[in-house]
Regions:
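Metal-centered catalytic cores of metalloenzymes
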Residues: 12-21, 26-35, 135-141, 149, ...
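An N-terminal structural lobe/cap that precedes and organizes the functional/catalytic core
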Residues: 2-105, 113
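Short, surface-exposed linear patches
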Residues: 66-68, 141, 262-265
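Short, structured coil/loop segments at alpha-helix boundaries
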Residues: 37-38, 58-59, 76-77, 146-153, ...
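Charge-dense, low-complexity intrinsically disordered regions
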Residues: 157-329
Length: 329
């Protein structure tokens, strides 16, 4: 018998890349999340979760942006260039219902309640859609491996999706009743145009004073989420952080966020983005101007190494220096 050919690193990388591409492709979900299903137009579109013409056009360079999302053909590279037309898209709305976002697509931010709602609702929608796809993706992954980590990931996605379904009921009712004052929120404004934009959510476990808010290990309890949207406009930038009013465990948390200094606000937004999203776009010129040390610090933070190893955190860690500052790009 001949010797079995040893699989090269190149062959292994190619095989893993092919598996990753196949898993991503088979896990895609095309479904309009708007509650008025009977009004849906025929086609589900590739909707931008961050405004294309208004924000991505401002941040992009030569039609490209940087995102911390590996591409299917190279799942080992974290920060990657994406074309503006592909960046931040998800198949979560039909063409008709995507028009509901025109008040934030076509108008400058003016602190109006409906605008705040739409920014936060879109942040919710993309994350809920990703949890739907995440559950499906872990099912696909089981075809390639029996590693227990897949079961753990599937449980995490399933629980997050379950909790966000409860949030969806509240968002849906607000849309159906045309009643948008359902959020406790804070808006931070900055007197410069930042070179990034982001949306996402975070499930905080402790407040800024180190007090426990909720326990992620309690699988029976419904977790409360913070949703956020950060974006530049003409000569200014804004960050909206919100929780549903019926998530009373976060009421005091939102109140404490209103008392932060601007330095603490910046640290907190950096913290939210590190912990709460990959839906982040960065201006390529700003990214490539960073030193390799700064890029490594960003990637290290984004990989959440401390969380993986269960490293302890100090009281108020959310508003302390996060190791890098997106506002300085």
């Amino acid at each position: 018998m001949g010797k079995k050919k040893k699989q090269s690193k190149k062959d292994l990388k190619r095989r893993l890349s092919e598996q990753f591409q196949s898993t991503v492709r088979k896990s895609r979900i095309k479904e309009c999340l708007h509650p008025k299903k009977e009004e849906c137009s025929e086609n589900i579109i590739k909707a931008h979760s961050i405004q294309n013409n208004k924000i991505l056009s401002k941040i992009s360079k030569n039609g490209n942006v940087i995102m911390p999302i590996p591409k299917p053909d190279n799942p080992f590279q974290l920060t990657t260039e994406y074309g503006r037309k592909r960046a931040t898209v998800f198949t979560g709305f039909c063409g008709h219902h995507d028009q509901m976002f025109s008040p934030i697509e076509d108008c400058d931010f003016n602190y109006e309640i409906k605008q705040v709602f739409l920014y936060i609702y879109r942040a919710f929608a993309v994350e809920y859609h990703r949890k739907m796809e995440g559950v499906k993706q872990q099912e696909e992954m089981k075809k390639y491996t029996s590693d227990s980590i897949i079961d753990d990931l599937q449980l995490a996605f399933t629980l997050a999706k379950r909790d966000m379904e409860k949030d969806k009921e509240v968002f849906d009712a607000a849309i159906l009743n045309n009643e948008f004052n359902i959020l406790n929120y804070v808006v931070y404004d900055f007197d410069k145009e930042i070179k990034f934009a982001a949306t996402g959510f975070l499930t905080p476990t402790d407040d800024l004073q180190g007090n426990k808010i909720q326990n992620l290990s309690d699988f029976e309890a419904k977790m409360s989420n913070l949703y956020f949207s950060v974006f530049p406009e003409e000569n200014k930038s804004y960050a909206i952080v919100a929780a549903l009013k019926n998530d009373e465990s976060l009421t005091d948390y939102i109140t404490s966020l209103k008392r932060l200094t601007q330095e603490e606000q910046i640290n907190f937004i950096n913290h939210l983005i590190i912990k709460g999203t990959e839906n982040l776009v960065i201006n390529p010129n700003a990214w490539y101007a960073l030193t390799e040390e700064d890029k490594e610090s960003f990637n290290y933070s984004f990989a959440q190494i401390e969380d993986f190893f269960g490293m302890p955190t100090d009281k108020g860690y959310q508003i302390k220096n996060q190791g890098f500052d997106l506002f300085n790009l």
